[in-house]
């Protein structure tokens, strides 16, 4: 198990993502995300960060009316795969290669433009330093009163292997009211992986719904 401040090196994703060998490439959307779709959570301008091969974004696009979806990943290869899958599914998604801990002003992502931001297994790959940069970029991207959805491995997952675990106490500190956020809910969930993954098919996770304040 990664320690509290461990990050997953970017080189790992460049060598693995989009090849079919990533344990997160299950070729279907995460069940936790499909349930949110059924609840009507996604609307307006949606940004899927770390979209990988696109299964969550494509599912949202196919099963949600009147949404405009942008999906990003650090690595070009899974974006290529995701574009092909979206075309075959006849779902219109804008795909971008973006490093979410870099300067976003040089990208096509627009400030305060997104009603809903989805993060399925991104936050838990960052070091403490990098996740502060990441949160600043979330604040740059999200609309006032926008919703940030995070699905990441939780402290309740005690099996060895995989990225760092996210502590509920850290979420409340990082996404505090003083920082311009309100945590609406943190629920136990499952992050599904392939059987080749160190945590098997059912990594214990938190599904967090976090609201940006209307005025910050």
Please give the residue ranges for each predicted region.
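Class I (Rossmann-like) S-adenosyl-L-methionine-dependent methyltransferase catalytic domain
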Residues: 1-47, 53-109, 126-140, 146-216
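Short catalytic micro-motifs in class I SAM-dependent methyltransferases
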Residues: 121-125
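Hydrophobic beta-strand segment of the Class I
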Residues: 117-118
């Amino acid at each position: 198990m990664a320690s509290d401040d461990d990050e997953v090196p970017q080189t790992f994703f460049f060598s693995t993502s989009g090849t079919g060998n990533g344990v997160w490439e299950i070729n279907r959307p995460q069940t936790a995300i499909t349930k949110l779709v059924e609840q009507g959570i996604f609307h307006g301008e949606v940004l899927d960060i770390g979209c990988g091969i696109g299964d969550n974004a494509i599912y949202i696009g196919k099963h949600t009316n009147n949404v405009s979806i942008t999906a990003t990943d650090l690595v070009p290869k899974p974006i290529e795969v995701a574009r092909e899958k979206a075309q075959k599914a006849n779902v219109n998604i804008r795909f971008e290669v973006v490093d979410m801990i870099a300067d976003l002003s040089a990208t096509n992502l627009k400030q305060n433009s997104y009603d809903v931001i989805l993060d399925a297994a991104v936050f838990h790959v960052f070091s403490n330093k990098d996740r502060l940069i990441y949160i600043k970029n979330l604040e740059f991207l999200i609309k006032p009163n926008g919703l940030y959805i995070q699905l990441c491995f939780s402290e309740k997952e005690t099996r060895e292997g995989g990225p760092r675990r996210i502590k509920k106490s850290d979420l409340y500190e990082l996404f505090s009211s003083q920082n311009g956020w309100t945590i609406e809910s943190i629920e136990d969930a499952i992050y599904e992986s392939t059987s080749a993954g160190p945590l098997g098919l059912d990594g214990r996770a938190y599904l967090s719904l976090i609201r940006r304040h209307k005025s910050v």
